[in-house]
Amino acid sequence: MSQVAQFIRDHQLDAMRIGGQKVGAGRDRAIEVLNPYSAERIGTVPKATLEEVRQAYALAHAYKPQLTRFDRAAILNKAAALVQVHLQDIAHLISAESGLCIKDAVYEAGRVSDVLLFGAQEVLKDDGQIFSCDLTHHGKQRRVYTQRAPLLGVITAITPFNHPMNQVAHKVIPSVATNNRMVLKPSEKVPYSAIYFADLLYQAGLPPEMLSVITGDPREIADEMLTHPNVDLITFTGGVAIGKYIADKAGYRRIVLELGGNDPLIVMEDADLEEASNLAVQGSYKNSGQRCTAVKRMLVHQSVAAEFTDLVVQKTKAWSYGDPANPDHLMGTVIDEAAAKFFE
């Protein structure tokens, strides 16, 4: 058994977190999680039933958060410190389930800590407003004060595979910062980073009812997560087709959709070609090319196209790749065979 597989077993990351409770798989309802590079089975996660999904929303909806701004900032700051303490464990977990090289995984773990710190700072900003009422001849000399309240319902969050913990952090941290409750479904391909992140937040003092992590087959549980009567907001990062499906199913619920990009690198005739070629290579290969901000098109002025192309080819040949666990490699693998064929 690999060290990561043992870490998963030791921390019971093969169980969902429903209101903080560890919920394992029922009979014949487990999803295998494979290391994309070695095809090693590093563990399983439950294939949630509709009853388990409904339980998560019921627990979240029944809980009424009472955390002060000070409380929320303290939780996020402590979680940031815990991420730093466990940074190497997190990086190896990210790398093993996603195939990202360890360099990229270490960077991602550091970014998670950053986002926690940013969230803690935002919590302390007063988001109330004051409006004067004597602005017209009908007005009176008085003022209206406003303050923001948490949603009445629950947030559904659905995250992709390409940044197993950082994408999760960008959903969960704003929810915690605003005293909301969330049911999160990470990609079934990379579930462990999300579950471990939830555990770190619980350890930092987050009431477990404020965050549940559900794993499962989207074909079985996605509609329930989109249409459950307790859902007030849906936030999704992923592909355009699924985003359109969510928008169609969500009805009058609030939705936040991040649906990829179509990012060009534009190189003009007076560009610094050394810098431009660096950006082209890094933008194409960092994170195994699996980023919404990855370079997808290069528009190069004809007068510098040949020289630019030579530089890109030269730097591509120097880009090291292979075993994601090798610290000398700059690129690991993509998430699965289907992704590799898509790239080809």
Specify the residue positions occupied by each region the protein language model found.
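ALDH superfamily catalytic-core signature
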Residues: 241-344
